[in-house]
């Protein structure tokens, strides 16, 4: 008879949690730098950042009729919510999502809670020097956005961070190590082959230089990656935007926001950003590997 789980310890109840795969298990020490970029918590922090910056972008630009402009202390408070995102916020977000059953909506609700709490935050005042208006702008949060508007930008930010702060430094270091070995062993003669048969000699340094040259080329391709983003609504048409605020140049608003995040504007999409840039990036990384 095959073995069953009957009578066995329920491993899902063990604390601390058992890793589901080796990246979070035996290789965790090696993969740890990626936690700040590619973990679920890092993704939610990026989502919170996008929601905050979208709110600031709309109010700063005077796009929404009647929406108040935010003071510098109010913007600083909002960005501080992102900077302070940690264990307490992760737990709170998990509790919210247990009710919403929707990850992006949970982030939206968390931000609305922080907006409501701004009235008690020391030093946060409105643009006129009076009480902060943050508790009154909760319904502007996520306005005109579909979840993919938030997600595509958040993934672009987190992937860019992982590539630029973790992968590229490691890749450049490997290339430089190979280049140094190529110089060190430039005169170390060794047998070369053609068609599996002994041929004219080569050196160990030259063969290491071949590898360094190939890898350096892939590094340049990764360095040139365009991290694309869009924020054009549920079908990629700015439909709700134009109906609600027909006088705004929504292409310019969207482009300005995406570029403000340090990403490249994708002007034509469906509901989702096409993700072609991700396929290109992963192909470059695969060739490096």
Task: Enumerate the predicted regions with their spans.
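A conserved active-site cap/scaffold subdomain adjacent to cofactor or substrate pockets
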Residues: 274-289
């Amino acid at each position: 008879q095959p073995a069953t789980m009957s009578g066995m310890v329920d491993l899902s109840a063990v604390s601390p949690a058992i890793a589901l795969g080796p990246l979070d298990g035996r290789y965790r020490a090696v993969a740890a730098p990626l936690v700040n970029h590619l973990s679920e918590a890092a993704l939610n922090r990026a989502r919170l950042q996008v929601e905050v910056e979208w709110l600031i972008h709309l109010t700063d630009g005077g796009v929404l009729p009647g929406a108040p402009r935010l003071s510098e202390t109010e913007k600083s408070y909002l960005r501080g919510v992102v900077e302070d995102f940690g264990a307490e916020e992760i737990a709170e977000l998990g509790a919210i999502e247990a009710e919403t059953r929707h990850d992006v909506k949970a982030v939206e609700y968390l931000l609305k809670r922080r907006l409501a709490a701004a009235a008690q935050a020391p030093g946060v005042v409105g643009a006129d020097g009076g009480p902060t208006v943050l508790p009154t702008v909760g319904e502007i949060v996520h306005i005109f956005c579909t979840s993919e508007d938030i997600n595509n930008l958040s993934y672009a930010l987190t992937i860019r961070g992982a590539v630029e702060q973790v992968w590229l430094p490691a890749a450049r270091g490997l290339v430089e190590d190979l280049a140094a070995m190529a110089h060190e062993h430039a005169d170390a003669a060794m047998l070369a082959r053609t068609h599996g048969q002994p041929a004219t000699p080569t050196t160990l340094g030259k063969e290491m230089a071949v590898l360094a040259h190939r890898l350096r080329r892939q590094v340049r391709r990764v360095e040139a990656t365009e991290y694309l983003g869009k924020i054009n609504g549920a079908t990629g048409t700015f439909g709700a935007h134009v109906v609600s605020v027909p006088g705004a140049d929504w292409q310019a608003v969207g482009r300005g926001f995406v570029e403000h995040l340090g990403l490249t504007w994708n002007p034509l999409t469906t509901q989702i950003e096409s993700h072609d840039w991700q396929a290109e990036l992963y192909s470059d990384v695969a060739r490096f590997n």
